[in-house]
Amino acid sequence: MADIVVMGAGLGGVIMAYEMKDQMRPEDKITVVTKDPIYHFVPSNPWVAVNWRTRESVEVDLAPTFARRGIDFKPVPVEKLDPEANSLTLADGSTLKYDYLIIATGPELAFDEIEGLGPVNGHTCSICHVDHAEKAAVNFEEFCKNPKPIIVGAVQGASCFGPAYEFTFILDTELRRRKIRDQVPMTFVTAEPYV
């Protein structure tokens, strides 16, 4: 019997848990450990930011979803990883032993590395997390009341540029639907060496 632990339950962690469950032997056990009991389908965040989707429509409660597939689930943050002992110490003080560990914790957003960047302490919107996308949706509705030039893009250090392009086209579409696109000069900014 092998104890398989997936650390993280975002897009990569959930897919990995499903794939591992399909491939493992009947006597093996798989456990997913993550800090958030709710899964947010990140690829839909650009839609949330223009009110094409709601937060509720892109969320899944992980406990019943994993239970249906026979995957153990611990919605508790990991405090310590001990590779020599093949164990994780969780925030509730419990220890989780493993034979195989898959780390799929996703990105750590670093808005503080650029002054003025970010939806919390900065002056920019973000679609990186559903919380950010909801705030962007509120800002977008206010923006549409008084349309003006807008800048869309991704900064240096971004690990994924695709959503910035997607959001640009979504924004263009929604502004056209609202018949205000002609009032919104749009500039796309990227740290990529070429487009």
Segments the model singles out, each with a brief description of its role:
Residues 2-72, 157-195:
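Beta1-alpha1 glycine-rich phosphate/pyrophosphate-binding loop at the start
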